[in-house]
Curated annotation (Swiss-Prot):
Belongs to the outer membrane factor (OMF) (TC 1.B.17) family. This is Nickel-cobalt-cadmium resistance protein NccC. One of its GO terms (molecular function) is efflux transmembrane transporter activity. Component of the NCC cation-efflux system that confers resistance to nickel, cobalt and cadmium. It comes from the Bacteria. Residues 1-48 form the signal peptide. GO terms for biological process: response to cadmium ion. The lineage of its organism: Bacteria, Pseudomonadati, Pseudomonadota, Betaproteobacteria, Burkholderiales. InterPro entries: OMF, OMP_efflux.
Length: 437
């Protein structure tokens, strides 16, 4: 019980939707309402249906999400291919029966049986080139996995924050509906006392209907965002709540000296270019003759004696010197280099854009918070004036809409900040909202 109360108190103190340093009437304090809604939604399911804190969910998803498991299998396959590339060529066993059915010579059979083993050898560095290709392909697979991990972390962070924002919008919509119902009650009382025209009741009822529609849409948005988060994280059951806040989380510090080459996309493109470059060496050595050394024994049919045989085999690159194969490999390297140059430019632009977006969202959040404080104060004054019969209902409804819009802007600003920070972490090659690189 103490842990629950402590968690509730923490939400009241630090929830991102609360206007700071502002005294408001009890019915206008949106942050506690939103905090209670989040707490109830988060603690409503203590079982597996509740999404764990983001850091825990990220580590679980990196190990268990189907998307990550696919790439992990690809890395293991590339590692197995690299190990297989080191294998030596297998020897070949041959048996040859000669002079079957041939006429006897002096009453003796002319049959001869030959048994031999041929061991092929890769000369001219063919084996070393093949091993290098396997290693480069393995490094490229690892780079692709690292890029996928970084991209996945950014996507998961945005999905988690989007679900949290949906809960905030739902709590805001429920509070807006409650305020609309209170205004309708006050309007009916004023109409009954003759202080307002009957039209005011219709206007207040229309406001309630609009608030009900907004609340229904917000509830639907919560369901869809939780379904998206569940599918992305690989959960077998849809989550019914979240257990921590990411909208108010402080990001990991960006390490100094980060360059464009630290981008996972650049590293992946560079690793793929290196793999194609290693393949060129393989193609250039493909025409080198295949050499084999043969040793065996020949048994003569007319006696019990045997003779030994030794041989050397080699292919002759007379018609095929693999010129076109070499040209194709060289062109693949050129294409990979062009992709690397393009990715490097895009990564540089993406990082500059992410840095700019982070700075912009910080300013946007500060402005939205100030606007929310002003709108809350305006609604407080307008509500007191309406209850005293000094403020028209139309003006009160407009002020409440402005308050809802201001709180909505605060939620949107916090979500935009998470998106920008996730994009910056992605550009820097870091897991979003994690210290690790």
């Amino acid at each position: 019980m103490g842990a629950v109360l402590k968690a509730e108190a923490n939400i009241f103190r630090s929830h991102p939707f609360r206007p700071m340093n502002q005294a408001t009437p009890k019915k206008l304090r949106s942050a506690p309402c939103i905090g209670v809604a989040l707490l109830l939604m988060a603690t409503g399911s203590i079982q597996a249906a509740e999404a764990p804190p983001y850091s825990v969910l990220l580590q679980q998803s990196l190990a268990m999400a189907p998307t990550m498991m696919v790439q992990a299998a690809n890395v293991r396959a590339a590692g197995a291919d690299a190990a297989q590339a080191r294998a030596w060529l297998n020897p070949r066993f041959d048996t040859l029966a000669e002079n079957l059915g041939a006429p006897s010579s002096g009453g003796q059979s002319q049959r001869q049986n030959t048994y031999s083993i041929t061991q092929p050898f890769e000369i001219g560095g063919k084996r070393g080139a093949r091993i290098e290709v396997g290693e480069r392909n393995y490094e490229a697979a690892q780079a692709r996995e690292r890029q996928l991990r970084v991209n996945y972390a950014a996507e998961l962070a945005v999905a988690y924050a989007t679900a949290e924002a949906a809960f905030g919008r739902q709590a805001l919509a429920e509070e807006n509906l409650a305020l609309a119902n209170e205004e309708l009650t006050v309007a009916r009382a004023l109409v009954e006392t003759g202080k307002e025209a009957t039209l005011r009741t219709a206007q207040a009822q229309a406001s309630v209907s609009a608030a009900q529609a907004i609340e229904a849409a917000a509830s639907s948005d919560v369901t869809s965002t939780l379904a998206r988060l569940s599918a992305l994280s690989g959960a077998t059951e849809a989550y019914t709540g979240i257990s921590s806040s990411l909208l108010s989380a402080q990001p990991a510090m960006t390490p100094g000296g980060t360059t464009t080459d630290d981008s996972p996309a650049v590293r992946t493109a560079e690793a793929e270019r290196n793999a194609f470059d290693a393949q060129v060496n393989v193609e250039r050595k493909r025409w080198i003759p295949e050499v084999g050394i043969t040793a065996g024994v020949r048994r003569y049919g007319w006696s019990n004696e045997s003779g030994y045989i030794v041989g050397l085999t080699a292919s002759i690159p007379l018609f095929d010197r693999n010129r076109n194969g070499i040209d194709a490999a060289v062109q693949r390297v050129a294409a990979a280099q062009a992709r690397l140059d393009t990715v490097r430019l895009e990564a540089n632009a993406a990082r500059r854009s992410a840095v700019s977006q982070v700075a912009a969202t910080d300013k946007q959040l500060a402005a939205a918070s100030q606007g929310e404080q002003a709108a809350s104060e305006a609604y407080r004054v307008g509500r007191l004036g309406y209850e005293a019969g000094k403020t028209p209902l139309v003006e009160l409804l407009a002020v409440r809409r402005a308050l809802v819009d201001a709180r909505q802007l605060t939620i949107d600003a916090r979500l935009a900040r998470v998106r920008a920070l996730a994009a910056l972490a992605q550009a820097d090659g870091r897991l979003a909202f994690e210290e690790s690189r």
